[in-house]
């Protein structure tokens, strides 16, 4: 039988429900049960599961306990508001005030604490998490059997699984760790979002190494302000969450984290700051990669290459080298393994069908990232620089004007278009972006065009491209769908860009 959701381990020793109740300090149900799994999704229940019925924004998981029981749940974990509905199924019920906050530790217990058998490296920050995770996994691959968990995909050895979110829910995450252990994986590189830290998705995890890339405004629809955002990220650098931190000394929040972290910290600086433990020197940024020398804490010199373009990817590559060195790998061997990584899906990913100009797709979907990518591409562009860019609906509205302004100021042509409008009016989003572009003084502003239809926007920018130019399609990166009014339609920037180029050549 095929079950929805991420994979589960094939073999799990049953845990008595009474043991789980004792672990949480909850009242022991009159009836015991043998628990072999846990899920928060009633549709993904398997026989032997503890079903975590969580309170939600609109519905309560207890509304679905009958479905869970029908699929083979042997017990329910819920809060006081869900207790009566859960008890009505006749299943034993564990009642705690914060079931979401407890299910990570329960999942770890049920699956036999699989994370303890893995080298766990977690990466957090506003930008660069995905790239750094891929680079770390690439370096680890040279000496270990690896796993990867992040925005684009999950990997267990060579098996690839599509990701639903950057960091899985705690119940799924512990199951994934157990599958990795079962299949001989012994090291995992994993993105850790601020949502994951606040919502308890990494409860039950203690990372061997936690990496901090940077912090800039993002997710302001979720966090009240930058202080709240920083506090969320800083949770990863406490003894409950990690053993050692690797922190970007070039970032102002990184320097603050060095002072406030509750675990030992190793610092790195792509800008060559003399106070950092590890620093980059002799940086040469090329059109598709960069080379540099890493100076270590004992003044050792390591030859390094970032397989991705842009100064920001020097920082991501340096972060990966330092994390792997902290994990005990030889730094030069780590750097060589990272240099061999073939690229990261949707991160400065080149689309080449023989056209006489550079065409790339990038996930940049916040102001800092858009500015960084445009500046990096400007350095390697002989002709004109063109960007296609939109802003997602039902997300942080404060970044729309700055993103429109950044595109207009730093590109010769800025084609503003739809990203994932979700439930919002695409034209209203575009009007806000356009207002931002209009604030750029005319003598600093490139040509600005607006197309609601993303495919039309891509076709328009391709039609303008001349030899020596660069075309950047930004915002969606690896994504393979576009969410318009709650309906996700197939849409892959890489394929649409490729087809547009082929049509102009045809």
UniProtKB/Swiss-Prot annotation:
GO BP terms in the entry: cell division; cell wall organization; peptidoglycan biosynthetic process; regulation of cell shape
Coiled-coil regions listed in the entry: none
Keywords (A to Z) from UniProt: ATP-binding, Cell cycle, Cell division, Cell shape, Cell wall biogenesis/degradation, Cytoplasm, Ligase, Magnesium, Nucleotide-binding, Peptidoglycan synthesis
The reaction(s) this protein catalyses: UDP-N-acetyl-alpha-D-muramoyl-L-alanyl-D-glutamate + meso-2,6-diaminopimelate + ATP = UDP-N-acetyl-alpha-D-muramoyl-L-alanyl-gamma-D-glutamyl-meso-2,6-diaminopimelate + ADP + phosphate + H(+)
Record-listed UDP-N-acetyl-alpha-D-muramoyl-L-alanyl-D-glutamate binding positions: 42, 166-167, 193, 201
One Gene Ontology term, aspect cellular component: cytoplasm
InterPro entries: Mur-like_cat_sf, Mur_ligase_C, Mur_ligase_C_dom_sf, Mur_ligase_cen, Mur_ligase_N, MurE/MurF_N, UDP-N-AcMur-Glu-dNH2Pim_ligase
Residue positions of motif Meso-diaminopimelate recognition motif: 419-422
Function noted in UniProt: Catalyzes the addition of meso-diaminopimelic acid to the nucleotide precursor UDP-N-acetylmuramoyl-L-alanyl-D-glutamate (UMAG) in the biosynthesis of bacterial cell-wall peptidoglycan.
Family: Belongs to the MurCDEF family. MurE subfamily.
Name of the protein in question: UDP-N-acetylmuramoyl-L-alanyl-D-glutamate--2,6-diaminopimelate ligase
Organism of derivation: Streptomyces avermitilis (strain ATCC 31267 / DSM 46492 / JCM 5070 / NBRC 14893 / NCIMB 12804 / NRRL 8165 / MA-4680)
């Amino acid at each position: 039988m095929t079950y929805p959701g991420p994979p589960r381990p094939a073999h799990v020793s049953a845990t008595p429900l009474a043991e789980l109740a004792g672990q949480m300090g909850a009242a022991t149900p009159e009836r015991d049960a043998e628990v072999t799994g846990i899920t928060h999704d009633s549709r993904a229940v398997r026989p032997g599961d503890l079903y975590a019925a969580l309170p939600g924004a609109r519905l309560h998981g207890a509304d679905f306990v009958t479905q869970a029981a029908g699929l083979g749940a042997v017990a329910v974990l819920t809060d006081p508001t869900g207790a009566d509905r859960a008890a009505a199924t006749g299943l034993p019920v564990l009642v705690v005030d914060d079931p979401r906050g407890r299910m990570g530790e329960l999942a770890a217990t049920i699956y036999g604490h699989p994370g303890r058998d893995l080298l766990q490296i977690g990466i957090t920050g506003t930008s660069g998490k995905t790239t750094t995770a891929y680079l770390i996994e690439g370096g680890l691959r040279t000496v270990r059997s690896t796993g990867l968990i992040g925005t684009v995909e999950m990997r267990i050895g060579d098996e690839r699984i599509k990701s639903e979110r950057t960091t899985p829910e705690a119940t799924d995450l512990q199951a994934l760790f157990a599958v990795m252990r079962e299949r001989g994986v012994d090291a995992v590189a994993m993105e850790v979002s601020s949502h994951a830290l606040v919502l308890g998705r990494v409860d039950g995890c203690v990372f061997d190494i936690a990496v901090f890339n940077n912090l800039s405004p993002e997710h302001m629809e979720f966090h009240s302000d930058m202080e709240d955002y920083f506090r969320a990220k800083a949770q990863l650098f406490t003894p409950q969450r990690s053993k050692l931190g690797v922190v970007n000394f070039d970032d102002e929040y990184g320097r603050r984290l060095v002072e406030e972290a509750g675990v030992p910290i190793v610092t790195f600086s792509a800008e060559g700051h003399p106070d950092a433990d590890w620093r980059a020197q002799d940086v040469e940024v090329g059109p598709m990669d960069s080379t540099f020398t890493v100076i270590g804490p004992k003044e050792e010199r390591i030859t390094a290459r970032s397989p991705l373009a842009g100064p920001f990817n020097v920082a991501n590559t340096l972060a990966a080298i330092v994390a792997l060195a902290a994990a005990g790998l030889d730094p030069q061997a780590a750097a060589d393994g990272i240099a061999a990584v073939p690229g990261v899906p949707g991160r400065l990913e080149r689309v080449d069908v023989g056209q006489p100009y550079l065409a790339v797709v990038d996930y940049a979907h916040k102001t800092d990232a858009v500015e960084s990518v445009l500046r990096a591409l400007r350095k390697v562009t002989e002709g004109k620089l063109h960007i296609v860019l939109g802003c997602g609906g039902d997300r942080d509205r404060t970044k729309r004007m700055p993103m429109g302004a950044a595109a207009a100021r730093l590109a010769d042509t800025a084609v503003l278009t739809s990203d994932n409008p979700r439930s919002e009016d695409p034209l209203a989003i575009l009007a806000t972006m356009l207002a931002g572009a209009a604030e750029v003084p005319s003598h600093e502003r490139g040509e600005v065009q607006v197309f609601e239809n993303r495919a039309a926007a891509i076709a328009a920018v391709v039609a303008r491209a001349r030899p020596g130019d660069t075309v950047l399609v930004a915002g969606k990166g690896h994504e393979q769908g576009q969410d318009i009014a709650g309906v996700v339609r197939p849409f892959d920037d890489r394929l649409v860009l490729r087809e547009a180029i082929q049509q102009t050549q045809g």
